[in-house]
């Protein structure tokens, strides 16, 4: 065989080998593309709601002391040189988070003990606001209104005003767009403290970037909303927007009083269905409900999540929003609250858009910020869904 013939044979074999290699690569690419398409389709089907808005949310009802997770508690203790009851994350979780089978309000309230201990200094309060805000930002929250009761942070000598100033400092140190709501508390012998909270709210009130509203929280069944008429008359006189916890431990009548006082938002409002007239009043006045499913299940406001009325209210045209309440104690996130509504009620992307739109419209902030939030959340887009 000549050198030329040998060269030609080698070239033929190489061309054949190349064709086989190319063919094999094409087959592999085709298989990979098919698998990738299937995986993407499955992922989209499983989480099309999250994809619709890139996992971005608004939390209007979030208590600072109820949002202290294990990592945050450990950081607050280290910063202040405090000793926690255990070094074990697993054991600390038991102190901070209610068990899945929470059977009593005492089990729930016990989880506030360590956060209350950690939030009695300006440093602790400042860092708590910053850490909680950073934490929820990492979970997809783009705007939040963090509420706390200044009178709960005076046990070690800090004044209500110093507590507010510390919280404002923490707000400045986070990149999350957030505001503060100051809570007055239901109870005995604290009228002066509540009045001071209202006066300080007026002093520090801004349209955005600080204190934007006041609230009334605490044992609703023991201390009826109707008892606080004068307190909120003063808030109205001073031009302070307010939300009131109502329709949670007490029934629909509590919500009626809150609306009569001038509340534009109701914390929870779960039980308005008990009185059709109150349902009609909520719709007529355009009042927004701040609903918190996991919280309401754990405090036994509802017996079963399948009975939760959020979707019924949404379908009835009531302005409802989805929130966390006490995310650290409940072991939840706002993304998880949306997933729960998907699981139990087949929440659609369009319904999520409505919930987020309601949250933007009800937020205690400026129109400019609301427009920014609408843009971030793509609320003007039409969401297509094949869900039934």
Where are these predicted regions, by residue range?
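Bacterial N-terminal signal peptides
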Residues: 25-38
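Metal-cofactor-binding active-site regions of metalloenzymes
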Residues: 39, 43-240, 249-254, 260, ...
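Conserved hydrophobic beta-strand within the GNAT/NAT acetyltransferase core sheet
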Residues: 242-244
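Detector for intrinsically disordered, low-structure N-terminal pre-sequences
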Residues: 13, 26-28, 43
């Amino acid at each position: 065989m000549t050198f030329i013939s040998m060269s030609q044979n080698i070239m033929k074999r190489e061309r054949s080998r190349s064709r086989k290699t190319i063919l094999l690569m094409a087959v592999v690419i085709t298989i990979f593309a098919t698998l990738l398409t299937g995986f993407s389709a499955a992922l989209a089907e499983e989480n099309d709601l999250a994809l619709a808005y890139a996992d971005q949310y608004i939390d209007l009802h979030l208590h600072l002391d109820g949002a202290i997770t294990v990592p945050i508690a450990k950081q607050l203790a280290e910063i202040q040189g405090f000793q926690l009851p255990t070094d074990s994350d697993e054991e600390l979780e038991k102190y901070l988070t209610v068990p899945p089978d929470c059977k009593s309000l005492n089990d729930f309230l016990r989880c506030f003990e360590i956060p209350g201990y950690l939030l009695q200094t300006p440093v602790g309060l400042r860092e708590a606001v910053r850490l909680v805000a950073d934490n929820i930002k990492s979970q997809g929250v783009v705007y939040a209104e963090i509420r706390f009761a200044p009178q709960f942070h005076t046990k070690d000598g800090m004044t209500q005003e110093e507590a507010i100033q510390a919280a404002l400092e923490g707000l400045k140190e986070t990149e999350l767009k957030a505001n503060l709501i100051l809570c007055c508390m239901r109870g005995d012998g604290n009228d002066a403290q509540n009045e001071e909270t209202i006066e300080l709210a007026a002093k520090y009130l801004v349209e955005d970037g600080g204190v934007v509203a006041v609230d009334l929280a605490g044992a609703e069944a023991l201390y009826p909303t109707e008892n606080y008429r004068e307190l909120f008359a003063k808030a109205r006189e001073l031009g302070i927007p307010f939300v009131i916890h109502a329709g949670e431990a007490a029934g629909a009548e509590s919500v009626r009083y809150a609306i009569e006082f001038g509340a534009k938002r109701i914390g929870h409002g779960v039980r308005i269905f008990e009185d059709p007239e109150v349902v009609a009043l909520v719709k007529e006045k355009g009042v927004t409900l701040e609903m918190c499913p996991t919280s309401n299940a754990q405090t036994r406001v509802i017996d079963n999540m399948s009975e939760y009325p959020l979707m019924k209210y949404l379908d009835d045209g009531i302005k409802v929003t989805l929130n966390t309440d006490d995310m650290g104690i409940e072991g939840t996130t706002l993304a998880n609250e949306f997933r729960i509504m998907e699981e139990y009620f087949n929440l659609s992307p369009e319904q999520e858009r409505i919930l987020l739109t309601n949250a933007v419209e009800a937020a205690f902030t400026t129109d400019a910020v609301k427009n920014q939030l609408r843009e971030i959340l793509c609320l003007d887009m039409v969401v297509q869904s094949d869900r039934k």
